Structures are given as structure tokens and as C-alpha cells.
């Protein structure tokens, strides 16, 4: 039998305990993996072992897929009404609200984000997402299409079947909600793999999924490595769709595996190198505040982080000074500490990756204007870092770093800055700051990006679509658009009085 992980917190911001089954969640129960191997889960705040979780192998994926198929053919899919699916989703959201402190603490423990941030942002958005799709479950309509008087013609939106979902470590619970919400609302069954770095909130959610009344096999959670468990999901011949959030590099591998197997439907939400354009007429105070939020939220570990900050020459010096002052106010430390703004990066691997980019920036001739060093003596903490004196060909300007590192770049001409902003392989998001609303909207429309923020940054809502252009992905998360990711459209032609 799988072990139970328990943990007690007695901190300035939270006092409580949790209990998490560390097994694989297959067919409505926790089980050991076939090979009974485990993965270490590490606390990024101190580098110490939290617990061990079961590792899913290809054989475990086969078992999970069979359970999902059985549920789809018997208790879910077209065998369960949209209103019943919606009731269960809403019950799940209520249980998340009831357990919000527990889930927030778990998120802070293995991810490193602060407890207060996890509660106010991640959990709030996760709950609103599940509620949003609870409302959609009985409203996924087709339409009657007028052709001629001899026929009745209409469309149906039908669930795809068994979907594989692979989620990242930067927003573990939120990405789970983004994935399972629309998939369950439309009647699909799920085999989901959380990141091996941050699996605990997904495993805790399995107990809530049980309590909410979802039939066995509808949601299966399999923990493991991307190269093995993720690969097995992407290439499985009986999985009808795969949805992946993560790096563009791995997204290519997922798409390739999907194509080489059964040409399964693919949704990808991938990397970004988002531009922020600040014109001379911008509200200086607000642009500083929003830009800091856009770059440093979640410790810079966000695909839509505004890392290329273009500031018009008329306010460049003032902006840089105020932005520097703002950055120096950011307080790093224990995710369960009082007044902490930024915790550690998620892992040693990610810490090393970010520090290598900082060294690359120095080596290529950029200036570290602020930050650029490790913080403290333990854990994976990195100072918020800004480069100046960059050129477009530098790695820190071109490549996604996925950490608290950005570049502030001076520009002169409004038309030229759009070319610079769009000069990227990515196109996930962009932001513009100007008090001239016509100029701001014109700039927003000129961005080659799936999301454009005007006088704000990194604002997300469950009802608003999110996704990328170019190498930032395929398909859209959130809102009504996400339902399309999980449905097949069937056209039905009914002969009324057409004689041959």
C-alpha cells in the first residue's frame, strides 16, 4: 500500500497539518506503481527531502488508460448528463474552498511560492476556474443549421474520450484546474501527470475528487518523470488527446510523439519572452508597479512574464530609477514568513539554469543593473535581476529564462519598437503602457501575441482565453474557447421528405 505523508506547520502565517497519499491515483483509489519505485520530492527553500512519491511506468499508464476508457464507456462521457457533471465540478470547487489553507500550504511547500500568494492568487484562480467550467457543463451546445426544407441538419459537441494531461511545476494546482475543468465539463476522462518537482497538491486534490463524487476512472493522476511517464502518455495508442503546458522544447517532443502514435489531438501552452512597451506618456508610477508585477510574480517562473522591457527615451532614466527602487523593496525568504514577496526557485536544476543565463549576460557584455546573485546560504534563492546595455542578439534577450531576470531596453520610435517587440520566436503575451488610449490599443493590436495587456500586466480571468502565437503554443486555455480543445464536432443530417 502507498505511504501517507503527513506534515505539520507552525509558522507566522499558517498553523495546521496535512495528510497526503503518495501513491498513484488510478480507478478511484491510491495504488503503488507496478515496479514500486519512487521519486524524491524536495523543499526548494532548504534543499531537503520532503517525502517520496510513487513513480508511474508505462505499465501503470496502461492500467490508468484502461480505467479511464471503462469510465468513459459506462459512467461518464455521454452516459452522464452535463448538469450532473457540473454538480460534481461545483462540489469540487466548494471542497477546495473548504481546504484552501491546506492546499495553499502544500503549494508553498514543494513549489516555494509564498503561502499568502498561493492562497490569494493560485487557489483563488483555481477555484474560480473549476466553478467557471461547472457552469459550462450543461451549456456546450451544438446548433441547428438551415439547409433546405427536406432535411433537418444540426451539430453536436461530443467528448473526445480519454485525454492525457501533462502539467508544469510553476503553477501546479492552477494548471491542474485549467486542464481538468474544461475536460471534465465536456465529458472526457483524464490521465494527468503533474511535475515530479511539485506533485503534492495534485495528489491532495485526488482525495477531494473522490469526496466530490466523481466515478472511479474519470480522473487518474500518475506521478513520474517527463521522459518516461510523460512520453508514455504522449505516445499511448489509446489516449485520444494530449494537452501539455511547459517548455517549447518539450512541447515539440510531445507533438512528435502524438503524431507518431495515433495522430492524437494536441493542445500546447508553451514558452514566452513577453515584451512590455512603455511610452513617454505612460503613468510612471503605475507602469513601474505593473511591470514589476509582470516580471517578478511567481519568482519570474511564468511563461507570460514580461522580460523584455522597452522604455521610451524620454522617461527611460526616471523609469529605471523608480523600477530599481521598486525591485530593492522585494523581500526574499521563507515562503511561510511574514512580509515575504519572493521565495526560492523551484529546484536546483532551475536555479542553475537561471544563474547560467545571468553569467551569459555578463559574458556577452550586458550590465547587471541590480541583483544578479544568489540570496542566502541554503535553498534556491536568486535576487531579482535587471540587465541594461543589452543587444537583440544576446541570449538573455532572445531566450526564455524562466526566472526573476529581465532587461530594460531604451527605444526612440514607436513603430520601430513594435518590430523589436515582435522579433521573437514566441508570441504568448505582451503589454503596453500609455495614457493615449488610441495609441495603446493600436499597439496592442500590433503585437503578435495571444494576450495583450493595456496599462496592466499578468491579469488572468477564468472566462478569458489564454494561449500563444508562433512557438508559444497551439489552442487556447480558459473561457469558452477551451471547451473546443476537448470536443469533437459531429454534423447530423436527417432526411425529412427527400425521396430518391
Curated annotation (Swiss-Prot):
The record marks 170 as: Transition state stabilizer. Gene3D superfamilies: Aldehyde Dehydrogenase, Chain A, domain 1 (3.40.605.10), Aldehyde Dehydrogenase, Chain A, domain 2 (3.40.309.10). It comes from the Eukaryota. It catalyses: an aldehyde + NAD(+) + H2O = a carboxylate + NADH + 2 H(+). NAD(+) binds at residues 246-251. Transmembrane segments: none annotated. CDD domains: ALDH_AldA_AN0554. The active site is at 269 (proton acceptor), 303 (nucleophile). GO terms for biological process: ethanol catabolic process. Pfam families: Aldedh (PF00171). Belongs to the aldehyde dehydrogenase family. This is Aldehyde dehydrogenase.
